[in-house]
């Protein structure tokens, strides 16, 4: 299911609001019961209430890489919440779990962003890593512009158990994000920018934002955009702290308090850098001399990324130790150096070609939106680096029919295409379907499994060896 279909579904749910008692047990999402209990208590009750079929879809081992994965509302896997999968009482219990993970202010935000205000928990994906009845766990709710993590901090020291993702479509393509649930965060950041001197503004403004999903902590050796908050005057530092407080204030007091502990352990908000951006990573409207709607606060152990163009996608990642980031699943190998951009694409293409037994692999640079830190690499790290959840596919083409760019890439690797030969090309389903001109005149695509599985298999067997 994609976001457009889900938004259409939200309209259908809104129209169904008049179906009366029947709707209560079928289409409509339950409101919260008003019961006040802890997330842990409610999550344990929820798991107990799931049917065997629902448990089979929703429950995962605690060390499953799904616990590390995030994006801005792509389907993560798990159970699709609906009247067909959970009865009214269980969906109400899930609604109570969601509300318990939010502050009083947050209960007026997250449940009212985007289609959630019409659908509630309906059509969200539910995944529970671990078992809240007996041990550590993480409950994940994913919907339109939402990956909400509920449960205690991870043993790895990640606040919220890992990155939080939120957003809202309102104000789409409009200056100032009018009527957006999280507009207040933008306004506070813009007040900070307005308070800067011209020289400070020049250092804060960066031409192009990083990809929104790149929020892995970098540690002390990281490179951060913008200016150190510590270098600003006290009143401006107070505004930076107000930005962070406005973001963390959405979540339950105990969860937010742990995030603040993580920040203070690493120097507080003063240890972050503040930047705003002329243009998003994916392009679009440029800020020019006007206020930007994209900002980022980042330090060795924390990232706050607010992308308000064309509408809001926002990401939070805060951890206790920037040198020991969240890593879930099997340790596959040791990465000798940071991989991003062209270097990460080289790893992807090497794995794709080897796993698909292809002559050449093609993965576009503009689709690389991840980063692999140096050091031990877990299965979850590769799931995050391959953020789009694409399938690996194989297509075939005659040498004479290869796109010029692909033929040039082959020559750069010492393979001179023969017009009369037929070549196996490993790529991703999106390219074979939507951007076929980048490949040439090709035959039908044949699936070869999930790309992330190919990456895991390659790193497990060959480490970080790359094609020449």
Protein language model annotation of sequence segments:
Residues 32-52, 57-62, 68-84, 95-99, ...:
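A cross-kingdom marker for long, charged
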Residues 331-468:
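Catalytic centers of hydrolytic enzymes
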Residues 89, 235-236, 419-421:
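A short, structured loop/turn motif at beta-sheet edges
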Residues 13-21:
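Terminal signal-anchor or tail-anchor transmembrane helices
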């Amino acid at each position: 299911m994609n976001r457009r279909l889900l938004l259409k579904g939200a309209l259908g749910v809104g129209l169904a609001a008049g179906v009366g008692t029947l709707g209560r047990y079928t289409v409509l999402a339950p409101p919260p019961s008003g019961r006040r209990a802890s997330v842990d208590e409610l999550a344990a009750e929820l798991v107990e209430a799931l049917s065997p079929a629902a448990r089979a879809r929703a429950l995962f081992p605690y060390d499953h890489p799904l616990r590390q994965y995030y994006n801005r509302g792509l389907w993560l896997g798990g159970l699709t919440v609906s009247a067909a999968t959970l009865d009214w009482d269980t969906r109400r219990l899930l609604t109570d779990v969601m509300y318990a993970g939010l502050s009083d202010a947050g209960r007026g935000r997250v449940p009212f962003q985007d289609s959630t205000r019409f659908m509630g928990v309906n059509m969200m994906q539910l995944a529970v890593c671990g078992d809240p009845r007996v041990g550590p766990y993480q409950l994940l709710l994913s919907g339109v512009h939402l990956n909400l993590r509920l449960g205690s901090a991870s043993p790895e020291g990640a606040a919220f158990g890992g990155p939080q993702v939120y957003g809202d479509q309102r104000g789409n393509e409009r200056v100032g994000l009018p009527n957006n649930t999280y507009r207040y965060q933008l306004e506070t950041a813009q007040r900070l920018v307005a308070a800067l001197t011209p020289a400070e503004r020049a250092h804060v403004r960066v031409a192009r934002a990083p990809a929104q999903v790149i929020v892995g902590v970098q540690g002390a050796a990281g490179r951060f955009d913008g200016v150190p908050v510590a270098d600003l005057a006290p009143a401006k530092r107070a505004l930076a702290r107000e930005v962070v407080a406005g973001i963390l204030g959405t979540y339950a007091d105990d969860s937010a308090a742990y995030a603040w502990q993580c920040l203070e352990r690493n120097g507080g908000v003063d240890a972050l850098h503040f930047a705003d951006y002329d243009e998003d990573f994916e392009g679009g409207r440029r800020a020019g001399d006007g206020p930007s709607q994209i900002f980022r606060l980042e330090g060795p152990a924390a990232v706050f990324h607010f992308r308000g163009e064309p509408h809001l996608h926002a990401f939070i990642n805060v951890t206790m130790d920037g040198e020991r980031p969240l890593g879930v699943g099997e340790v596959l190998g040791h990465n000798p150096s940071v991989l991003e951009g062209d270097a990460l694409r080289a790893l992807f293409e090497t794995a794709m070609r080897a796993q698909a037994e292809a002559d050449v692999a093609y993965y576009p640079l503009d689709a690389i939106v991840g980063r692999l830190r140096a050091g031990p690499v877990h299965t979850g790290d590769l799931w995050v680096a391959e953020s789009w959840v694409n399938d690996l596919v194989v297509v075939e083409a005659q040498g004479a029919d290869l796109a010029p760019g692909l033929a040039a890439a082959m020559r750069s690797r010492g393979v001179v295409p023969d017009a009369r030969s037929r070549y196996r090309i490993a790529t991703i389903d999106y390219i074979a379907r939507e951007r076929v001109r980048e490949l040439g005149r090709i035959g039908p695509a044949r699936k070869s499994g999930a790309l992330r599985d190919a990456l895991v298999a390659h790193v497990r067997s060959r480490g970080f060896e790359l094609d020449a």
